[in-house]
Amino acid sequence: MRQKLVIGNWKMHGSLAANAALLEGIKAAPARARLAVCAPFPYLAQCQALLNGSQVAWGAQDVSAEARGAFTGEVAASMLGEFGCTYALVGHSERRTYHGESDAVVAAKALRALEFGIIPVICVGETLAQREAGETEVVVGRQLQAALDALSVEQLGRVVLAYEPVWAIGTGKTASSEQAQAVHAFLRAEVRERDAGVADRMAILYGGSVKPDNAAELFSMSDIDGGLIGGASLKSEDFLAIGNA
């Protein structure tokens, strides 16, 4: 049975003082799920220091597809690896939308993360217009296929997927548990076409306005293995409640 995984995405929030209080609150209480936080780059060293020796992992919100060089503003996977980074989000809808990241770039970022022992959390999801046009499976299938084409079976076995319907991120809207389960089942079936064992073991997270009051229902679905949490990850009590859902 796959253990639940709950990853907090702080996005562009935080301060040294607020982070310290949040991290101390998270690591002080037990959770049924595995927990991790993805913090802004300037705070990764703080996460490393405060979470060292705890059961809470930490990660980055992005990683460069490039190994090194004249790429101002980029952060290399090798740099994250030196800090002991566990996870890196790749292909979050906000990166795809605001920075024009293509499926190929997302796959390249996943490959680079894996090269340095970092688990890429590959995010896929459709807009409201795409859902209403009946294109959900076409869109998320295309996004996933880029990774399937780029990764070996062994590499794929070290990946986490996250389904984040763009229309449900930060809007207060949430896909129903049945809607989310249908997409998660589709994604797992696509991975199974490549390797059944990998598909059965892979964590597929749901991200889209997950809160303490809807987490249990979402997480009860057979193919939903946890959550990628935005706003609710900024309050330790909410994040822990989701981790215990």
Curated annotation (Swiss-Prot):
Pathway given in the UniProt record: Carbohydrate biosynthesis; gluconeogenesis; Carbohydrate degradation; glycolysis; D-glyceraldehyde 3-phosphate from glycerone phosphate: step 1/1
Q: Which SUPFAM superfamilies match?
A: Triosephosphate isomerase (TIM)
What is this enzyme's catalytic activity, as reactions? D-glyceraldehyde 3-phosphate = dihydroxyacetone phosphate
User: What keywords would UniProt list here?
Assistant: Cytoplasm, Gluconeogenesis, Glycolysis, Isomerase
Q: Name one Pfam family in it.
A: TIM
Tell me the compartments it is located in.
Answer: Cytoplasm
Q: Which residues of this UniProt protein bind substrate? A: N9, W10, K11, G170, S209, G230, G231
Q: Which PROSITE patterns match?
A: TIM_1 (PS00171), TIM_2 (PS51440)
List the active site: H92 (electrophile), E164 (proton acceptor)
GO molecular function annotation? triose-phosphate isomerase activity
Q: What is its main location?
A: cytoplasm
The answer to whether the entry has keyword Protein transport is: no
GO BP, one annotated term: glyceraldehyde-3-phosphate biosynthetic process
A GO cellular component annotation here is: cytosol
Residue runs in coiled coils: none
* Superkingdom of this protein's organism: Bacteria
User: InterPro entries from the entry?
Assistant: Aldolase_TIM, TIM_sf, TrioseP_Isoase_bac/euk, Triosephosphate_isomerase, Triosephosphate_isomerase_AS
Which principal EC class is assigned to this enzyme? isomerase
Q: What's the EC number here? A: 5.3.1.1
Family classification: Belongs to the triosephosphate isomerase family.
What does the function comment of this entry state?
Involved in the gluconeogenesis. Catalyzes stereospecifically the conversion of dihydroxyacetone phosphate (DHAP) to D-glyceraldehyde-3-phosphate (G3P).
What the entry lists under PANTHER family is as follows: TRIOSEPHOSPHATE ISOMERASE
According to the record's subunit comment, the protein's assembly and interactions are: Homodimer.
Q: What is this protein called?
A: Triosephosphate isomerase
Species of origin: Cupriavidus pinatubonensis (strain JMP 134 / LMG 1197) (Cupriavidus necator (strain JMP 134))
Lineage runs: Bacteria, Pseudomonadati, Pseudomonadota, Betaproteobacteria, Burkholderiales
Q: Which gene encodes it?
A: tpiA
